[in-house]
């Protein structure tokens, strides 16, 4: 070791000390919230960022932290062992399940916008193959809050889970989810894709929309609106829109405000409308507009078939 400098020596010791046995011993000392923080810290390390959390960990060779603001610790996993940790988590039954459960929660929040604890139970039963009681769901959400309530893409309100991008009034929440029929993707892979697809459209559609907006935004508009921020606002609005007419009205108001070119009412028909029709919509609980209309037609047809024909009954 005499020929190694301090940095190289440290890397050598860390990578040789962090074995599967060492990780087993370390994880065995964690409570449930710390295990979740460990899983999320691993994800943050892939983004080259520390995890802000109020949870404290005893000194070890995997999780390092220093004090941040407002009582938070900035916790990170060194690059030298991040791959080792990621592989360990994916091979560890409990940690792997925590990772999937958290990913499903984020994905469901992006897909539905607003949903009940009961729907989260169903998501876990179908895609995690695990049954949770409502009390289990409450405890799970509390554990996430212990890690860091600010890092989530959702918030909990009166027994409901709402995306932080949701723009409904809180007093409308329970009315909105009453008798809701939620879209359930065919595969685990599909629902997990919505963890990244926050607007409910694929990357190709989002790029197409961004290109359209860049061509139609007035560069010298008085509101100093830019493509990135404006696209986020419009796409979020579209997830709340009951019909495409509502989208048209918003685009027209942006024209009147001098933000978009006048031609958008024509070009949007070929670009924005098809995107809206295929968008996973919060108004329709994750269904697209077309899917939900088909669902309503099917329900109406079934109700008509269930009506008793009194004349036939008497016969």
Task: Give residue ranges: language-model regions.
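A short acidic, leucine-rich amphipathic alpha-helix
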Residues: 38, 119-124
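Short capping segments at the starts of secondary-structure elements
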Residues: 44-49, 110-118, 220-225, 240
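Charged low-complexity interaction tracts in eukaryotic proteins
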Residues: 25-29, 71-84, 96, 139-186
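C-terminal helical accessory/scaffold domains
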Residues: 143, 158, 163-244
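Basic helix-extension-helix modules of the SAP/HeH family
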Residues: 1-76
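Positively charged, polyanion-binding regions of nucleic-acid-associated proteins
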Residues: 20-21, 94-116
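Charge-enriched amphipathic alpha-helical scaffolds
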Residues: 9-10, 53-62, 127-157, 242-278
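Short hydrophobic short-linear motifs embedded
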Residues: 304-314
């Amino acid at each position: 070791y005499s020929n190694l400098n301090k940095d190289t020596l440290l890397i050598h010791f860390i990578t040789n000390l962090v074995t599967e046995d060492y990780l087993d011993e370390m994880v065995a000392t964690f409570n449930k919230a710390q295990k979740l923080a460990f899983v999320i810290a691993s994800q943050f390390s892939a983004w080259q960022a520390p995890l802000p959390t109020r949870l404290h960990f005893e000194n070890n060779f995997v999780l390092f932290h220093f004090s941040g603001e407002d009582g938070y610790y900035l916790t990170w996993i060194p690059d030298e062992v991040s791959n080792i940790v990621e592989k360990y988590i994916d091979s560890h039954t409990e940690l792997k399940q925590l990772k999937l459960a958290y990913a499903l929660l984020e994905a469901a929040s992006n897909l539905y916008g607003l949903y009940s604890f009961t729907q989260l139970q169903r998501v876990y039963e179908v895609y995690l193959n695990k049954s949770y009681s409502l009390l289990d769901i409450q405890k799970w959400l509390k554990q996430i809050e212990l890690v860091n309530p600010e890092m989530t893409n959702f918030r909990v309100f009166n027994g409901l889970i709402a995306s932080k991008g949701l723009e409904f009034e809180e007093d409308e929440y329970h009315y909105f989810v009453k008798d809701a029929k939620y879209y359930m993707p065919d595969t685990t892979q599909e629902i997990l894709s919505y963890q990244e697809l926050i607007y409910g459209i694929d990357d190709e559609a989002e790029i197409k929309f961004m290109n359209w907006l860049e061509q139609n935004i007035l560069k010298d508009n008085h509101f100093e609106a830019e493509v990135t921020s404006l696209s986020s606002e419009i796409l979020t609005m579209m997830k709340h829109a009951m019909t495409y007419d509502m989208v048209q009205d918003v685009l027209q108001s942006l024209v009147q405000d001098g933000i978009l070119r006048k031609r958008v009412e024509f070009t949007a028909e070929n670009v924005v409308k098809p995107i809206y029709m295929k968008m996973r919509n919060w108004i329709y609980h994750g269904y697209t507009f077309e899917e939900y209309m088909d669902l309503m037609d099917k329900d109406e047809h079934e109700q008509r078939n269930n009506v008793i024909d009194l004349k036939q009954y008497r016969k």
